[in-house]
Swiss-Prot record:
The modification S-(dipyrrolylmethanemethyl)cysteine is found at C242. It comes from Shewanella frigidimarina (strain NCIMB 400). Keywords: Porphyrin biosynthesis, Transferase. The gene is hemC. It holds the Pfam family Porphobil_deam. CDD domains: PBP2_EcHMBS_like. Pathway: Porphyrin-containing compound metabolism; protoporphyrin-IX biosynthesis; coproporphyrinogen-III from 5-aminolevulinate: step 2/4. The porphobilinogen subunits are added to the dipyrromethane group. Its cofactor is dipyrromethane. Binds 1 dipyrromethane group covalently. GO terms for biological process: protoporphyrinogen IX biosynthetic process. This is Porphobilinogen deaminase. Its EC number is 2.5.1.61. It catalyses: 4 porphobilinogen + H2O = hydroxymethylbilane + 4 NH4(+).
Length: 309
Protein backbone atom coordinates (compact mmCIF):
# COMPACT_ATOMS: atom_id res chain seq x y z
CA UNK A 1 0.00 0.00 0.00
CA UNK A 2 1.30 3.46 -0.96
CA UNK A 3 2.58 5.54 1.96
CA UNK A 4 0.22 8.39 0.98
CA UNK A 5 -3.06 6.45 0.82
CA UNK A 6 -5.28 5.40 3.69
CA UNK A 7 -8.47 3.35 3.17
CA UNK A 8 -11.44 3.71 5.52
CA UNK A 9 -13.95 0.88 5.95
CA UNK A 10 -17.36 2.29 6.84
CA UNK A 11 -21.01 1.34 6.98
CA UNK A 12 -23.19 2.82 4.22
CA UNK A 13 -25.74 4.61 6.42
CA UNK A 14 -25.78 8.43 6.14
CA UNK A 15 -24.54 8.81 9.72
CA UNK A 16 -21.71 6.29 9.27
CA UNK A 17 -20.73 8.03 6.03
CA UNK A 18 -20.71 11.38 7.85
CA UNK A 19 -18.34 9.93 10.45
CA UNK A 20 -16.04 8.50 7.78
CA UNK A 21 -16.08 11.78 5.81
CA UNK A 22 -15.26 13.66 9.02
CA UNK A 23 -12.21 11.46 9.66
CA UNK A 24 -11.19 11.72 5.98
CA UNK A 25 -11.37 15.54 6.10
CA UNK A 26 -9.40 15.70 9.37
CA UNK A 27 -6.67 13.38 8.05
CA UNK A 28 -6.35 15.33 4.79
CA UNK A 29 -6.26 18.64 6.70
CA UNK A 30 -3.55 17.45 9.10
CA UNK A 31 -1.52 15.55 6.47
CA UNK A 32 -1.40 17.51 3.17
CA UNK A 33 -0.68 15.12 0.30
CA UNK A 34 -2.42 12.18 1.96
CA UNK A 35 -5.17 10.55 -0.12
CA UNK A 36 -8.04 9.04 1.87
CA UNK A 37 -10.38 6.54 0.19
CA UNK A 38 -13.70 5.26 1.55
CA UNK A 39 -14.79 1.62 1.36
CA UNK A 40 -18.54 1.59 2.18
CA UNK A 41 -20.11 -1.76 3.11
CA UNK A 42 -23.18 -3.30 4.76
CA UNK A 43 -23.04 -5.09 8.11
CA UNK A 44 -25.31 -7.71 9.65
CA UNK A 45 -27.00 -5.01 11.74
CA UNK A 46 -27.75 -3.00 8.59
CA UNK A 47 -29.21 -5.94 6.66
CA UNK A 48 -31.50 -7.52 9.28
CA UNK A 49 -34.08 -4.77 9.79
CA UNK A 50 -37.22 -6.74 10.65
CA UNK A 51 -35.98 -8.06 14.00
CA UNK A 52 -35.30 -6.13 17.24
CA UNK A 53 -31.54 -5.78 17.76
CA UNK A 54 -31.78 -7.41 21.18
CA UNK A 55 -33.25 -10.53 19.53
CA UNK A 56 -30.57 -10.86 16.80
CA UNK A 57 -28.02 -11.44 19.54
CA UNK A 58 -24.26 -11.32 19.43
CA UNK A 59 -21.88 -8.42 19.81
CA UNK A 60 -20.49 -6.34 16.99
CA UNK A 61 -23.55 -6.41 14.73
CA UNK A 62 -22.35 -3.21 13.05
CA UNK A 63 -18.60 -3.83 12.93
CA UNK A 64 -17.63 -7.41 11.98
CA UNK A 65 -17.56 -6.87 8.20
CA UNK A 66 -15.42 -3.75 8.64
CA UNK A 67 -12.95 -5.70 10.78
CA UNK A 68 -12.69 -8.49 8.19
CA UNK A 69 -11.82 -5.84 5.56
CA UNK A 70 -8.91 -4.64 7.72
CA UNK A 71 -7.68 -8.16 8.49
CA UNK A 72 -7.76 -8.96 4.74
CA UNK A 73 -5.87 -5.70 4.02
CA UNK A 74 -8.71 -4.26 1.93
CA UNK A 75 -8.92 -1.34 4.37
CA UNK A 76 -6.49 0.34 6.78
CA UNK A 77 -8.89 1.75 9.37
CA UNK A 78 -12.55 1.51 10.36
CA UNK A 79 -14.59 4.37 11.78
CA UNK A 80 -17.23 3.47 14.37
CA UNK A 81 -19.81 4.97 16.70
CA UNK A 82 -18.26 4.09 20.05
CA UNK A 83 -21.61 2.93 21.40
CA UNK A 84 -21.76 0.22 18.68
CA UNK A 85 -18.19 -0.99 19.22
CA UNK A 86 -17.72 -4.24 21.17
CA UNK A 87 -15.35 -4.19 24.11
CA UNK A 88 -13.25 -7.03 22.67
CA UNK A 89 -11.36 -6.92 19.37
CA UNK A 90 -10.23 -9.67 17.00
CA UNK A 91 -6.56 -10.59 17.29
CA UNK A 92 -4.49 -8.09 15.32
CA UNK A 93 -6.97 -5.20 15.64
CA UNK A 94 -7.46 -2.53 18.30
CA UNK A 95 -9.03 0.82 19.12
CA UNK A 96 -6.41 3.42 18.24
CA UNK A 97 -8.11 6.82 18.55
CA UNK A 98 -11.22 8.31 20.15
CA UNK A 99 -12.20 11.64 18.57
CA UNK A 100 -13.78 14.58 20.42
CA UNK A 101 -17.28 13.77 21.61
CA UNK A 102 -20.46 15.34 20.25
CA UNK A 103 -23.48 15.85 22.56
CA UNK A 104 -23.91 12.47 24.32
CA UNK A 105 -27.56 12.93 25.34
CA UNK A 106 -30.67 11.25 23.99
CA UNK A 107 -33.07 13.41 21.97
CA UNK A 108 -36.87 13.45 22.20
CA UNK A 109 -38.31 13.77 18.69
CA UNK A 110 -42.00 14.44 18.10
CA UNK A 111 -44.15 16.51 15.77
CA UNK A 112 -46.83 17.17 18.40
CA UNK A 113 -45.25 17.06 21.85
CA UNK A 114 -42.33 18.87 23.50
CA UNK A 115 -41.18 16.24 26.01
CA UNK A 116 -41.83 12.79 27.47
CA UNK A 117 -43.78 14.38 30.32
CA UNK A 118 -46.17 16.01 27.80
CA UNK A 119 -47.12 12.71 26.13
CA UNK A 120 -50.70 11.61 26.83
CA UNK A 121 -51.46 8.28 28.47
CA UNK A 122 -51.06 5.39 26.00
CA UNK A 123 -48.90 7.39 23.56
CA UNK A 124 -46.64 5.26 21.34
CA UNK A 125 -42.88 5.84 21.69
CA UNK A 126 -40.40 4.31 19.24
CA UNK A 127 -37.00 2.97 20.32
CA UNK A 128 -35.14 -0.32 19.83
CA UNK A 129 -32.85 0.35 22.81
CA UNK A 130 -33.47 -1.67 25.97
CA UNK A 131 -31.58 1.04 27.88
CA UNK A 132 -34.01 3.72 26.74
CA UNK A 133 -37.01 1.42 27.21
CA UNK A 134 -36.25 0.68 30.87
CA UNK A 135 -35.78 4.36 31.74
CA UNK A 136 -38.90 5.51 29.87
CA UNK A 137 -41.03 2.77 31.41
CA UNK A 138 -39.76 3.58 34.90
CA UNK A 139 -40.77 7.23 34.46
CA UNK A 140 -43.94 6.65 32.40
CA UNK A 141 -45.31 3.09 32.73
CA UNK A 142 -48.49 4.23 30.93
CA UNK A 143 -46.70 4.72 27.59
CA UNK A 144 -46.57 2.09 24.83
CA UNK A 145 -43.02 1.29 23.67
CA UNK A 146 -42.80 0.06 20.07
CA UNK A 147 -39.63 -1.24 18.40
CA UNK A 148 -37.97 1.09 15.89
CA UNK A 149 -35.19 0.04 13.49
CA UNK A 150 -33.45 1.54 10.47
CA UNK A 151 -31.18 4.52 9.91
CA UNK A 152 -32.02 8.02 11.16
CA UNK A 153 -33.93 9.00 8.00
CA UNK A 154 -36.01 5.81 8.08
CA UNK A 155 -36.89 6.34 11.73
CA UNK A 156 -37.94 9.95 11.16
CA UNK A 157 -40.10 8.87 8.20
CA UNK A 158 -41.88 6.32 10.41
CA UNK A 159 -42.60 9.06 12.95
CA UNK A 160 -43.86 11.40 10.23
CA UNK A 161 -46.18 8.74 8.81
CA UNK A 162 -47.97 8.51 12.16
CA UNK A 163 -46.65 5.14 13.37
CA UNK A 164 -45.39 6.78 16.58
CA UNK A 165 -46.27 9.79 18.75
CA UNK A 166 -42.58 10.27 19.55
CA UNK A 167 -39.24 8.56 19.00
CA UNK A 168 -35.98 8.66 20.96
CA UNK A 169 -32.69 9.02 19.05
CA UNK A 170 -29.10 9.89 19.92
CA UNK A 171 -28.78 13.68 19.75
CA UNK A 172 -25.30 13.39 18.19
CA UNK A 173 -26.62 11.67 15.07
CA UNK A 174 -29.25 14.34 14.44
CA UNK A 175 -26.73 17.14 15.01
CA UNK A 176 -24.19 15.57 12.64
CA UNK A 177 -26.80 15.12 9.91
CA UNK A 178 -27.88 18.77 10.40
CA UNK A 179 -31.33 17.67 11.61
CA UNK A 180 -31.19 19.73 14.83
CA UNK A 181 -34.61 21.21 14.08
CA UNK A 182 -36.17 17.77 14.55
CA UNK A 183 -35.11 17.72 18.22
CA UNK A 184 -38.09 18.75 20.35
CA UNK A 185 -36.11 18.34 23.55
CA UNK A 186 -32.70 17.18 24.73
CA UNK A 187 -33.21 14.54 27.43
CA UNK A 188 -30.87 15.21 30.35
CA UNK A 189 -28.59 12.47 31.64
CA UNK A 190 -30.62 12.58 34.87
CA UNK A 191 -33.76 11.59 32.92
CA UNK A 192 -32.11 9.12 30.54
CA UNK A 193 -28.55 7.98 31.17
CA UNK A 194 -26.84 7.62 27.75
CA UNK A 195 -25.19 4.49 26.37
CA UNK A 196 -21.47 4.03 26.98
CA UNK A 197 -19.53 5.97 24.35
CA UNK A 198 -22.63 7.68 22.94
CA UNK A 199 -21.72 10.66 20.75
CA UNK A 200 -18.07 9.61 20.35
CA UNK A 201 -16.36 8.33 17.20
CA UNK A 202 -13.61 5.72 17.45
CA UNK A 203 -11.03 4.60 14.92
CA UNK A 204 -9.87 0.97 14.79
CA UNK A 205 -6.80 -0.26 12.93
CA UNK A 206 -4.30 -3.11 12.74
CA UNK A 207 -2.19 -3.15 15.90
CA UNK A 208 1.07 -3.68 13.96
CA UNK A 209 0.52 -0.82 11.48
CA UNK A 210 2.92 1.87 12.72
CA UNK A 211 2.38 4.09 9.64
CA UNK A 212 -1.38 4.31 10.15
CA UNK A 213 -1.06 4.76 13.92
CA UNK A 214 1.22 7.77 13.40
CA UNK A 215 -1.22 9.32 10.91
CA UNK A 216 -4.15 8.84 13.31
CA UNK A 217 -2.45 10.14 16.48
CA UNK A 218 -3.41 13.85 16.05
CA UNK A 219 -7.13 12.95 15.99
CA UNK A 220 -7.04 11.69 19.59
CA UNK A 221 -9.07 13.73 22.15
CA UNK A 222 -7.72 12.82 25.58
CA UNK A 223 -10.66 14.02 27.71
CA UNK A 224 -13.10 12.05 25.55
CA UNK A 225 -10.84 8.99 25.85
CA UNK A 226 -10.89 9.11 29.66
CA UNK A 227 -14.68 9.47 29.71
CA UNK A 228 -15.32 6.70 27.21
CA UNK A 229 -12.74 4.34 28.77
CA UNK A 230 -14.51 4.64 32.14
CA UNK A 231 -17.90 3.97 30.55
CA UNK A 232 -16.61 1.03 28.52
CA UNK A 233 -14.77 -0.47 31.50
CA UNK A 234 -18.05 -0.56 33.42
CA UNK A 235 -19.80 -2.16 30.45
CA UNK A 236 -16.99 -4.71 30.00
CA UNK A 237 -17.14 -5.82 33.64
CA UNK A 238 -20.93 -6.16 33.31
CA UNK A 239 -20.34 -8.21 30.12
CA UNK A 240 -22.69 -5.92 28.24
CA UNK A 241 -23.00 -5.67 24.47
CA UNK A 242 -24.58 -2.69 22.70
CA UNK A 243 -28.09 -4.16 23.18
CA UNK A 244 -28.46 -4.33 26.94
CA UNK A 245 -30.31 -2.18 29.50
CA UNK A 246 -27.09 -0.52 30.69
CA UNK A 247 -26.43 3.22 30.87
CA UNK A 248 -23.06 4.85 31.58
CA UNK A 249 -22.04 8.49 31.52
CA UNK A 250 -18.76 10.06 32.66
CA UNK A 251 -18.04 13.76 33.17
CA UNK A 252 -14.71 15.44 33.91
CA UNK A 253 -14.15 18.48 36.13
CA UNK A 254 -10.48 19.40 36.26
CA UNK A 255 -8.65 16.16 37.04
CA UNK A 256 -11.71 14.54 38.60
CA UNK A 257 -13.90 12.07 36.72
CA UNK A 258 -17.44 11.25 37.88
CA UNK A 259 -19.11 8.19 36.38
CA UNK A 260 -22.80 7.38 36.70
CA UNK A 261 -24.10 3.97 35.72
CA UNK A 262 -27.32 2.00 35.72
CA UNK A 263 -28.68 -1.45 34.96
CA UNK A 264 -32.43 -1.87 34.61
CA UNK A 265 -35.17 -4.35 33.83
CA UNK A 266 -36.45 -3.60 30.30
CA UNK A 267 -39.96 -3.32 31.79
CA UNK A 268 -38.76 -0.51 34.09
CA UNK A 269 -39.74 -2.39 37.25
CA UNK A 270 -36.25 -2.21 38.74
CA UNK A 271 -33.35 0.14 38.03
CA UNK A 272 -30.05 -0.04 39.94
CA UNK A 273 -28.08 3.23 39.84
CA UNK A 274 -24.61 4.06 41.12
CA UNK A 275 -21.98 6.82 41.03
CA UNK A 276 -18.23 6.81 41.51
CA UNK A 277 -15.61 9.60 41.40
CA UNK A 278 -11.83 9.75 41.27
CA UNK A 279 -8.83 10.78 39.20
CA UNK A 280 -9.48 10.76 35.45
CA UNK A 281 -6.24 8.81 34.98
CA UNK A 282 -7.91 5.95 36.90
CA UNK A 283 -10.79 5.86 34.39
CA UNK A 284 -10.73 2.10 33.80
CA UNK A 285 -10.49 1.24 37.51
CA UNK A 286 -13.39 3.62 38.26
CA UNK A 287 -15.54 1.93 35.64
CA UNK A 288 -14.74 -1.51 37.00
CA UNK A 289 -15.45 -0.48 40.59
CA UNK A 290 -18.85 0.98 39.65
CA UNK A 291 -19.70 -2.25 37.83
CA UNK A 292 -18.79 -4.25 40.95
CA UNK A 293 -21.04 -1.99 43.02
CA UNK A 294 -23.97 -2.51 40.61
CA UNK A 295 -23.36 -6.28 40.53
CA UNK A 296 -23.34 -6.43 44.34
CA UNK A 297 -26.79 -4.81 44.34
CA UNK A 298 -28.47 -7.19 41.90
CA UNK A 299 -27.38 -6.16 38.40
CA UNK A 300 -26.30 -9.70 37.52
CA UNK A 301 -29.80 -11.08 38.14
CA UNK A 302 -31.29 -8.48 35.79
CA UNK A 303 -28.69 -9.04 33.04
CA UNK A 304 -28.88 -12.85 33.27
CA UNK A 305 -32.65 -12.62 32.72
CA UNK A 306 -32.16 -10.33 29.69
CA UNK A 307 -29.58 -12.66 28.11
CA UNK A 308 -31.81 -15.69 28.73
CA UNK A 309 -34.87 -14.13 27.08
Amino acid sequence: MSENIIRIATRKSPLAMWQAEFVKAELERIHPGLTVELLPMSTKGDVILDTPLAKIGGKGLFVKELEVAMLENRADIAVHSMKDLPVEFPEGLGLQVICEREDPRDAFVSNNYKSISELPQGAVVGTSSLRRQCQIRAARPDLVIKDLRGNVGTRLAKLDSGDYDAIILAAAGLIRLKLNERIANFISAEESLPANGQGAVGIECRTDDARVKALLAPLEHLETRYRVLAERAMNTRLEGGCQVPIGAFAEINGDNLTLRGLVGNPDGSQIIIGTVSGSKTDAVALGESLAEDLLSRGAKTILDAVYAS
